[in-house]
């Protein structure tokens, strides 16, 4: 994991859940270093950990590397988050006993398109597609590609039209780069040509928002993921209308539940969860939630840590998580 606020929340919740189960948990942040990720996992396996929850492994090496770890340490249980398994030919693979966890990325994308359609009900139903400037980078990050699937469903049926797809040119400075690209692009369109802007990632969205403010534009925008900076921008009551996200505290508990059930050999209880995808096998997806500008503005001093104070009930819903008798007794729910 990278040591961002949402993963700090994840880590805290994971540790609290582990303690409730009578286990101890340690967190190691690799801060987006592929080498550190592999070295840390190798070291943890050598140190005798019973289970590992690993996040954001690279698609070009995760399957081969983790396959080697499970072969060398057959008693070690592993669950992954946002980590796709593909071989050198690009074909999807599985690792026996390893459950893969993801956000419901296509759902995050679709929920945001629905938000945009709700802003233009007459156009969406009668006048033709809603014209969208899409901030997206395909074939770059697996999660972005999964989000594209949910977005394209609406394009296929003619509800939206993508005017153009843009992305930052400098990934080391994504916010400022995205601002420059967005300003340059938006200037090329006449007023009213762009109905809305859909962003695949909130860091890119921050640049877009700053571009819109610099241009004095009232084009509405939405984005995937959320952080305190996004919330502050939404609280201004201007262009940023909604974020699609998941509850990162619940995500930490969820990951610990899955790994604990793996360690107990209770795969049937994992498969019984409503978020388990039987057709994909050993695959679970966290339901998406939309946080709107109206919700943010209805509260005071809202941050990602107290977001539940203004979000709807789906944000704190836990009915989709795997469970069993001893788990319910330990957690009280």
How would you describe each model-predicted region?
Residues 64-107, 127-131, 228-240:
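Flexible loop/hinge segments that line or gate small-molecule binding clefts
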Residues 5-23, 108-112, 142-162, 177, ...:
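Short, solvent-exposed amphipathic alpha-helices that sit
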Residues 37, 99-130, 144, 178-182, ...:
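Hydrophobic alpha-helical segments within soluble ligand-binding/sensing domains
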Residues 19-31, 131-134, 154-175:
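Short beta-strand elements in bilobed, periplasmic/extracellular small-molecule ligand-binding domains
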Residues 1-17, 21, 26-41, 49, ...:
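Extracytoplasmic "Venus flytrap"
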Residues 38, 50-73, 78, 150, ...:
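Hydrophobic alpha-helical
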Residues 128-136, 254-333:
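Hinge/cleft segment of the Venus flytrap/periplasmic-binding protein
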Residues 196, 210-287, 291-297:
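Exported/periplasmic ABC-transporter solute-binding proteins
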């Amino acid at each position: 994991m990278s040591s961002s606020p949402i993963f700090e929340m994840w880590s805290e919740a994971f540790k609290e859940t582990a303690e409730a189960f009578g286990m101890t948990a340690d967190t190691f942040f690799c801060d987006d270093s592929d080498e550190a990720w592999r070295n840390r996992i190798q070291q943890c396996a050598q140190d005798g950990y019973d289970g590992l929850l690993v996040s954001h492994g690279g698609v070009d090496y995760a399957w081969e590397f983790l396959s080697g770890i499970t072969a060398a340490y057959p008693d070690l249980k592993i669950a992954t988050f946002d980590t796709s398994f593909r071989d050198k030919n690009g074909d999807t693979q599985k690792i026996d006993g390893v459950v893969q966890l993801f956000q419901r990325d296509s759902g995050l994308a679709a929920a945001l398109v629905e938000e945009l359609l709700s802003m233009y009900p007459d156009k969406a139903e009668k006048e033709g597609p809603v014209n969208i400037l899409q901030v997206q980078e395909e074939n770059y990050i697996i999660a972005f590609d999964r989000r594209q699937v949910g977005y394209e469903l609406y394009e296929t049926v003619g509800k939206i039209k993508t005017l153009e797809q843009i992305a930052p040119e400098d990934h080391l400075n994504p916010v400022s780069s995205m601002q420059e690209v967005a300003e340059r692009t938006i200037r090329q369109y006449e007023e009213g040509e762009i109905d809305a802007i859909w962003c695949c990632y909130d860091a890119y969205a921050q640049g877009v928002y700053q571009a819109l403010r610099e241009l004095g534009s009232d084009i509405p925008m939405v984005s995937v993921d959320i952080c305190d900076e996004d919330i502050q921008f939404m609280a201004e009551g201007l262009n940023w209308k909604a974020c699609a996200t998941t509850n990162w505290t619940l995500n930490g508990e969820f990951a610990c539940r899955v790994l604990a059930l793996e360690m107990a050999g209770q795969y049937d209880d994992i498969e019984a969860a409503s978020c388990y995808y039987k057709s994909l096998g050993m695959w679970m997806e966290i339901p998406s939630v939309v946080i709107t500008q109206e919700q943010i503005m209805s509260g005071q001093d809202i941050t990602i840590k107290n977001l539940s104070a203004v979000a709807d009930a789906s944000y704190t819903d836990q009915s989709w998580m795997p469970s069993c008798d001893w788990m319910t007794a330990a957690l009280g729910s």
